[in-house]
């Protein structure tokens, strides 16, 4: 199991890039924390999710007055 945004998922064996595409994330507006480290967007395709990994995906939103 991979823990993504606090939920256990059966996503081991796919890349971060593939996961983001499956879930329709816009990679221009997110940051991925992989096992407590922010990873560069260039690493998304080569970073393969493994059992025990912890991933947090943070989206940026504009706002203000």
Ranges and model annotations:
Residues 1-65:
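Ubiquitin-like/PB1-type beta-grasp interaction modules and other compact soluble beta-rich domains
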């Amino acid at each position: 199991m991979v823990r993504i945004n606090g939920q256990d998922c059966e996503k081991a064996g796919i890349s971060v890039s593939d996961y983001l595409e499956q879930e329709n994330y816009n990679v221009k507006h997110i940051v991925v924390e992989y096992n407590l480290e922010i990873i560069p967007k260039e690493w998304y395709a080569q970073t393969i999710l493994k059992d025990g990994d912890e991933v947090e995906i943070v989206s940026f939103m504009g706002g203000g007055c």
